[in-house]
UniProtKB/Swiss-Prot annotation:
Pathway: Purine metabolism; IMP biosynthesis via de novo pathway; 5-amino-1-(5-phospho-D-ribosyl)imidazole-4-carboxamide from 5-amino-1-(5-phospho-D-ribosyl)imidazole-4-carboxylate: step 1/2. Keywords: ATP-binding, Ligase, Nucleotide-binding, Purine biosynthesis. It comes from Shigella sonnei (strain Ss046). It is an enzyme of class 6 (ligase). This is Phosphoribosylaminoimidazole-succinocarboxamide synthase. PROSITE patterns: SAICAR_SYNTHETASE_1 (PS01057), SAICAR_SYNTHETASE_2 (PS01058). Belongs to the SAICAR synthetase family. Its EC number is 6.3.2.6. The gene is purC. Coiled coil: none annotated.
Length: 237
């Protein structure tokens, strides 16, 4: 399957059309951003790491009965995916307090959240992805009540699957975001799951093993991503 025209260039991925109108090529670049794209740097191997990490996670979620857009890997940095009509709202699950939640509520980082929190954010970099709720989604027509309920159900199901997967690898799944779209009327998981869009801590040391290493200038970003992938059994080379 050959990629054709560039359709969209995001902060770390590029989307291309193919000869099949129902399929797209997703290319993972080496770019790493923080502050809604205000700070961007390149790291060798990052595109490959996130592409293969994403394929591994999407495969695990598909095995658990969660519909995903993933079709197959095409190269070290590219995969073939279904073309979705994307919902402009991100779903976030928080198992522990971190990031914006800590700043917003003034609570201690790392406290366990039971049951996990579920948040919605409008995908809009210029507005810094403002938090919204189900009422906003319905009023502004971003997604139907039924499809939003399905997105929430699938997000919690993914959390159940992934918490165990990471726990077995000696990691804490602190929080993560998912994006969904519609494929022939069905709610399907799209975009990606990688350490770029999740927080992962070492279970023993609480060392951060995700993009917070870049956001907080901790260093060792690629080494952390590779360590997480190895623990999970992701085939990299």
């Amino acid at each position: 399957m050959q990629k054709q025209a560039e359709l969209y260039r995001g902060k770390a991925k590029t989307v291309y059309s193919t000869e099949n109108p129902d399929l797209l090529v997703l290319e993972f670049r080496n770019d790493t951003s923080a502050g809604d794209g205000a700070r961007i740097e390149q790291f060798d191997r990052k595109g490959m790491l996130n592409n293969k990490f994403n394929y591994f996670i999407m495969s695990k979620l598909a095995e658990a009965g969660i519909p995903t857009q993933m079709e197959r890997l095409l190269s070290d940095t590219e995969c073939l995916v279904k073309k979705l009509d994307m919902v402009p709202v991100e779903c976030v699950v928080r198992n522990r307090a971190a990031g914006s939640l800590v700043k917003r509520l003034g609570i201690e980082e790392g406290i366990e959240l039971n049951p996990p929190l579920f948040d919605l954010f409008l995908k809009n970099d210029a507005m810094h992805d403002p938090m919204v709720n189900e009422s906003y989604c319905e009023t502004f027509g971003w997604v139907s009540k039924e499809n939003l309920a399905r997105m929430k159900e699938l997000t919690y199901k993914a959390n159940d699957v992934l918490k165990k997967l990471f726990d077995d690898a000696g990691l804490i799944l602190v929080d993560f975001k998912l994006e969904f779209g519609l494929y022939k009327g069905e709610v399907v998981l799209g975009d990606e799951f990688s350490p770029d869009g999740s927080r992962l801590w070492d279970k023993e040391t609480l060392e951060k093993m995700d993009k917070d290493r870049f956001r907080q200038s901790l260093g060792g970003l690629i080494e952390a991503y590779e360590a997480v992938a190895r623990r999970l059994g992701v085939q990299l080379d």
